[in-house]
Amino acid sequence: MSLRSLRALCLTSFFIADVRDGLGPFLGIFLTQRHWQAEDIGLLMTVGGVAGLLATLPAGFITDTSRHKRVLLAGVCLAITLTTLLLWFSQKTSVVALSQVASGICAAFVGPLIAGITLGLTRQRGFSAQMGKNEAFNHAGNFFTALIAGAIAWYWGIGGIFILMACTTLLTLVALLAIRGGDIDDDAARGIEAASTPSLPGFAILFRHTPLLIAGVTLMLFH
């Protein structure tokens, strides 16, 4: 595995923390300043969350079959940012609903894509350790960008959050480009370690393997 690609993956996890959730908690503040009612804000945020939940399963399938995970991750990051920036120009109900649904669907791809890229770089033997590093960088990214966002909102207003998100998106794309495509083993990213690996089980294994089904239901309820 390439040390450069692994470091770039950590930086990707750091910067993507601010991109993944769009405006995050600042969305409610932004819409309240535009004279939205709390119940309307809550409804549309719920719609976006439900859209993201429904997209989780197909996002996993698409990630598993894709051989262009970096490009796909760059695409969903750009889509989240662009649909969020729409809110600055229009706060119509239809525009906000479109933004939240699109952002929710795109955000569902981020976790599986990061996991797939990680597995493709480290194979199974190094996956757990690298995922731990990814999460550490991701939480650090959440912490620092929240501090910066709070300072920006305090001094320059909520509009500065849009600029911050655009900047972190650009930094995410730069970090993604630093991951060498040739370092990602697409077969390993799907759990295939060698040519002798038996064919991967299908979706039906969930219903034949009780512990796996319980784990899946638990994760679904968690979300």
Positions of the model-derived regions?
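Helix-loop junctions at membrane interfaces in 12-TM secondary transporters
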Residues: 88-99
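Helix-loop boundary and gating motifs at the non-cytosolic
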Residues: 2-49, 213-218, 223
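C-terminal membrane-cytosol helix-exit motif in multi-pass small-molecule transporters
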Residues: 167-189
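Juxtamembrane intracellular "pre-TM" segments in multi-pass secondary transporters
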Residues: 1-3, 181-216
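Structural signature of the two symmetry-related core transmembrane helices
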Residues: 71-85
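Cytoplasmic helix-loop-helix junction between adjacent transmembrane helices
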Residues: 101-138
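Helix-to-loop junctions at the C-terminal end of transmembrane segments
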Residues: 55-68, 153
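Central cavity-lining transmembrane alpha-helices of secondary-active solute carriers
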Residues: 43-61
